[in-house]
């Protein structure tokens, strides 16, 4: 995993270099998880971010780019700049952690690295979302929430593959996970 905030010097400059080295020297699955700058950070930073993402995309099997500006849709108008950046960092962490948990957590239907590799190897742009549900309609609510995620700026339409992970309590019934 290569996680970075794009638009500045460090993440934008280092992430493509690290990805290139990983691709050229190993058979690793290279997954980029990055954030794009908030609008208030300016056009120059946005342009630098887009150029960095374009370069990073050349060296990643899969790239998930999250626009920080979309965070304004889900957070309080009174959020401080510091907390907005903290929230952006948390989105990166959740993205990486969720993919890692698919591999490391044993479930009713076991998925492993081979499954993740099959979906993410040479996949290009990625779309990832999480949904939560509770109560009688928890399964429908979780799916709806995941599909309507305001943080994503690309569509699931035209996807080449899907990695779908369901996590529930010990009371999860098979009727909620059967097609």
Language-model regions, residue ranges each:
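Tubulin/FtsZ superfamily GTPase core signature
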Residues: 1-179
